[in-house]
Curated annotation (Swiss-Prot):
Keywords: Acetylation, Cardiomyopathy, Cell adhesion, Cell junction, Cell membrane, Cytoplasm, Cytoskeleton, Disease variant, Glycoprotein, Membrane, Nucleus, Palmoplantar keratoderma, Phosphoprotein, Repeat
Region (Interaction with DSC1): 574-661
Example GO biological process: positive regulation of cell-matrix adhesion
Protein name (record): Junction plakoglobin
Noted disease: Naxos disease: An autosomal recessive disorder characterized by the association of diffuse non-epidermolytic palmoplantar keratoderma with woolly hair and cardiac abnormalities such as dilated cardiomyopathy and arrhythmogenic right ventricular dysplasia. Arrhythmogenic right ventricular dysplasia, familial, 12: A congenital heart disease characterized by infiltration of adipose and fibrous tissue into the right ventricle and loss of myocardial cells, resulting in ventricular and supraventricular arrhythmias.
Complexes and interactors: Homodimer. Component of an E-cadherin/catenin adhesion complex composed of at least E-cadherin/CDH1 and gamma-catenin/JUP, and possibly alpha-catenin/CTNNA1; the complex is located to adherens junctions. The stable association of CTNNA1 is controversial as CTNNA1 was shown not to bind to F-actin when assembled in the complex. Interacts with MUC1. Interacts with CAV1. Interacts with PTPRJ. Interacts with DSG1. Interacts with DSC1 and DSC2. Interacts with PKP2. Interacts with PKP3 (via N-terminus); the interaction is required for PKP3 localization to desmosome cell-cell junctions.
SUPFAM superfamilies associated with the record: ARM repeat
Glycosylation sites: T14
Listed Pfam families: Arm (PF00514)
Known tissue expression: Expressed in the heart (at protein level).
InterPro entries for the chain: ARM-like, ARM-type_fold, Armadillo, Beta-catenin
Amino acid sequence: MEVMNLMEQPIKVTEWQQTYTYDSGIHSGANTCVPSVSSKGIMEEDEACGRQYTLKKTTTYTQGVPPSQGDLEYQMSTTARAKRVREAMCPGVSGEDSSLLLATQVEGQATNLQRLAEPSQLLKSAIVHLINYQDDAELATRALPELTKLLNDEDPVVVTKAAMIVNQLSKKEASRRALMGSPQLVAAVVRTMQNTSDLDTARCTTSILHNLSHHREGLLAIFKSGGIPALVRMLSSPVESVLFYAITTLHNLLLYQEGAKMAVRLADGLQKMVPLLNKNNPKFLAITTDCLQLLAYGNQESKLIILANGGPQALVQIMRNYSYEKLLWTTSRVLKVLSVCPSNKPAIVEAGGMQALGKHLTSNSPRLVQNCLWTLRNLSDVATKQEGLESVLKILVNQLSVDDVNVLTCATGTLSNLTCNNSKNKTLVTQNSGVEALIHAILRAGDKDDITEPAVCALRHLTSRHPEAEMAQNSVRLNYGIPAIVKLLNQPNQWPLVKATIGLIRNLALCPANHAPLQEAAVIPRLVQLLVKAHQDAQRHVAAGTQQPYTDGVRMEEIVEGCTGALHILARDPMNRMEIFRLNTIPLFVQLLYSSVENIQRVAAGVLCELAQDKEAADAIDAEGASAPLMELLHSRNEGTATYAAAVLFRISEDKNPDYRKRVSVELTNSLFKHDPAAWEAAQSMIPINEPYGDDMDATYRPMYSSDVPLDPLEMHMDMDGDYPIDTYSDGLRPPYPTADHMLA
């Protein structure tokens, strides 16, 4: 009986609205009942209006009530209700006073009647909703046991009809809350959805759960009833509406229900969701991709499942083929999460992810641009050999002119990695004013190491080993970058930044025109100061027998190597050579010849080779007892080290007695020059040896500047997995409980 009443319920609202004017004169501008000066007349008016409303209403709700008793109760309640409605909507207005509301309407101005009508209309609407809310809740509560029974019926037709009724109830808030309060009914809906083969029943049951998922209580009821595995099964449905209801319900569960993510993973939800990326509805794809992001965020296993099911390729395809901003944004969020996974990164890059993301760097959507920038930044260390990135590189150079910290961090980091060991990219960036843009970025960055360090690394790459390297070295000077770069050597800058700056200074010193401005910027005293500090720190650990620790990811031995190598190149200039000598550095350089690190031995021998060109310095080198370690280095496996050692020995032996010179000559001939006449000639004539620093990294020790070193993925603004502050669907926070089409706007 209650179920039948549910079908008649909408009639009540319409009829109440149609007869509502009898309770108020606002609609017609006059009372619908004739005013009376007697109290009896007024009472009769109330009763007449009330009876008219009561007569209509009781056709739905008084079935089964004895006529005499039911009529009396309903007349009393509705009479009082009509009176309350009138008093609430038009307080203080009697039948006689209502005629005063009539006024002549002036064109362009609201009449008194119209102004009075505005609040009354709002109140009327509120009353309609209130009556509906109460009656919906009561009817739904009474019908729940019967509906639960019908949903469990063996007759599919009965089950379908019951599902349709419950679906109608779930569309109204009051009855929906009643449904959520019945675990038995929700469980019956889940069972029906899971077991049915009827498409209409599947559509109704998924729609019911979708409607319930707009409330926290509904989400909990679905979760406790085992709804998640059932919803995951529905992702295989051929019916588009069923797919939509299932994915949006799962999306709401993932957003707001604790434990839902694990439940979806255990139900193999990812394996069902990734193939859905081949659908062609942009709004459906937007919800699906956000589900993937919620599941992959902070969960390495989920990322690998997405990879195994072809997720990177499908996501890149979406970025390449669609223009719907919300879809591009949600897809870029998934790619950003995957971009810190070592296994997913190559797959994204190989699928053309760098190029697809680069397409959107000029989008009008700031949030999309920022996601693409972070993802490019995180992928760039495995994309150093990628082709077709010319437009991306040009856009990144242009992005260096903006003031947004995140944009600058991403642009500098990506440029640093993409110019690593890639001569073509280095040349392209240099030719497109990349050096100038990077210097300006450094000047604006201030103390923001996240910008300054990758910018310096990019400049270090641009100033070495490509056809336009000399142009880049000169460009730094011409754009007044040298003073700013030298200042970065000051403590308390982080050691990674100091290390990158030392390497850049070494490259700048390869250009003779830069020597004077470098000297004016007092670069040599700063390098010597850093060298002494780093060497002392390293020696303390050697003396204590402890392993050299990393400071911010940098070993002090790397700083020693870098400073010595930079001083080696600077010493080619006579003025610089004299300044280095006067700072009493020779004893330290001689000590470095005993280092266990081959690269340090090489740069130490190199700087001594340059200093030995001056007799005073050569004598000082000899006085420090350098001959013994230099003799040993003649047998070094590193050809450059052996050549430098030979040149120093040859120079300091010039003023020795004939016996000493003969012994040195024999040693040189036996160890090095027997098979290398060119090296012998170089040692004799003291021609500076321009051996390039190799690209290969030592197996146990990473050289300071011997190669371009790609930056690791940033542990910020990417996946908090390392990262990142939770992005949301709006520019502010997520809406608490989205409406049915919150993703479809």
